[in-house]
């Protein structure tokens, strides 16, 4: 495709995303810069061991000097090594997306699933598209075994989700605003390398993000721009049935192990009994037990909500327990300038929230880098990709290897790559590792990295799988004993 046309497509994509995020951010006015007393401090940086190629400046920064000197072509690593990768070469469109899921079937086949579309299906320019299925039996040599090309899989946006308990993969058709709500459901339990399509149905109302009850029987279709959080019964995978639509805007959401709680990032809408302003951004806890129990005409109740001074765009919240105590790991995407050109450039990044009293959730610590700090804004603004509203410095997704006593959390932090934090002491997390792959020349936008995906894990081998929008799928091993077992 001619370069001027490609640039036009890319710029239109940015314009649409900015408009969509503005409508779904739930912030009616731009915020001033957070005061010094409100700005959380960066997480202590990692100590890099043998074999590392550490960053050259402040934590998380990839400078223009790094690019012009050729340093970015070597990549940046700290207590990590790449053991395998998969990507189409010389691509114009994206080759990685928002989610990486892992599933091991009864026969022992180990599989990875990841979307390749990101904002819009620009990968169709390269005759690629959909959700890639990789056989990861040998993680040093991932093998593409299938491409899922049904409507939702062609453009799932942030909705690709998997139930490990049931062996079900699902997504809702979406884009940066919202898609028409077509839900695709696949059975992966028999042979994970070759998913079996069970249904394609317009049951999701509007799509952008999703959630899945761990038992794989309730799929939630969500949109941050419209109060249309929809629960769908997947008891019969071939016949999805809408249960109800909840009047709440939801970006990312996670469901508790028993299916009775939904943890919503975003949260604008008009929930009966809401404990906060209708358009307040943050994290909301919902009681969805009547949906899980399949009660006739179920009622959903808001339990609580919480926000924080450094908020940008709440992305996802994951329930965990550490030593028997419940917490959430939440991450904001991008900066507040993404949704408002007059924004102060506040970077939300990540945090840990204590929900021991679920009626009074409380932020207890933060997951952020030195480059995220307001005092470093002038320094970072000239870095490659830093001023693109859909790239830049900031967070996008976090995930944990287990929800019970996880020792680490791994987060995609866009230009800063994959970052790994030790959370055994949730009040005092610390960075232990990072991986930012070598960059490659690009026509537009300029050469940089675009780590956006929720990662998956192989704890027994200390591996983390994730994707970069520009360079594809990576299997990364944490080295030097940085990832503690307990």
Residue ranges and their predicted role:
Residues 27-29:
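Periplasmic/extracellular, small/polar-rich flexible segments of pilin-like filament-forming proteins
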Residues 31-486:
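Feature marking well-ordered beta-strand scaffolds used for ligand recognition
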């Amino acid at each position: 495709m001619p370069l001027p046309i490609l640039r036009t497509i890319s710029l239109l994509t940015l314009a649409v995303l900015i408009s969509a995020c503005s409508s779904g951010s739930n912030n009616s006015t731009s915020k001033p810069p957070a005061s010094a007393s409100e700005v959380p401090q960066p997480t202590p940086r990692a100590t890099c061991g043998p074999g590392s190629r550490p960053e050259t400046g402040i934590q998380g920064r990839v400078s223009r000097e790094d690019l012009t000197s050729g340093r970015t072509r070597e990549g940046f690593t700290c207590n990590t090594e790449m053991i395998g990768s998969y990507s189409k070469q010389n691509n114009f469109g994206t080759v990685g997306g928002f989610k990486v899921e892992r599933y091991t079937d009864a026969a022992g086949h180990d599989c990875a699933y990841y979307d390749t579309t990101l904002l819009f299906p620009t990968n169709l320019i390269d005759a690629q598209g959909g959700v890639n299925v990789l056989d990861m039996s040998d993680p040093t040599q991932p093998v593409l075994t299938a491409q899922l090309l049904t409507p939702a899989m062609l453009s799932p946006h942030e909705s690709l989700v998997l139930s490990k308990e049931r062996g079900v993969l699902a997504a809702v058709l979406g884009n940066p605003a919202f898609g028409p709500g077509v839900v695709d459901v696949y059975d992966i339990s028999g042979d994970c390398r070759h998913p079996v399509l069970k249904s394609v149905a317009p049951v999701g109302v509007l799509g952008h993000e999703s959630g899945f009850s761990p038992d794989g029987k309730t799929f939630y279709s969500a949109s941050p721009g419209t109060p249309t959080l929809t629960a769908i019964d997947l008891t019969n995978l071939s016949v999805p049935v809408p249960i109800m639509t909840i009047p709440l805007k939801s970006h990312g959401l996670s469901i508790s192990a028993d299916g009775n709680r939904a943890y919503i990032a975003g949260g604008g809408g008009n929930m009966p009994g809401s404990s906060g302003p209708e358009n307040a951004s943050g994290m909301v806890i919902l009681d969805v037990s009547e949906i899980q129990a399949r009660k006739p005409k179920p009622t959903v109740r808001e339990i609580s909500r919480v926000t924080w001074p450094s908020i940008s765009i709440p992305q996802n919240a994951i329930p965990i327990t550490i030593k028997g105590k419940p917490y959430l790991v939440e991450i904001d995407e991008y900066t507040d300038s993404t949704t408002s050109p007059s924004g102060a450039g506040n970077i939300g990044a990540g945090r840990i929230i204590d929900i021991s009293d679920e009626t009074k959730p409380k932020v207890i610590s933060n997951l952020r880098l030195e480059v995220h700090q307001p005092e470093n804004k002038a320094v970072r603004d000239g870095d490659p990709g830093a001023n693109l509203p859909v790239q830049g410095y900031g967070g996008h997704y976090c995930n944990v290897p287990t929800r019970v006593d996880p020792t680490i959390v791994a987060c995609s932090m866009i230009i800063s790559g994959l970052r790994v934090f030790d959370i055994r002491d949730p009040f005092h997390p610390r960075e232990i590792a990072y991986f930012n792959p070598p960059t490659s020349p690009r026509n537009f936008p300029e050469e940089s990295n675009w780590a956006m995906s929720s990662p998956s894990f192989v704890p027994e081998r200390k591996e983390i799988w994730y994707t970069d929008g520009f360079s594809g799928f990576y299997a990364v091993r944490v080295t030097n004993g940085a990832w503690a077992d307990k």
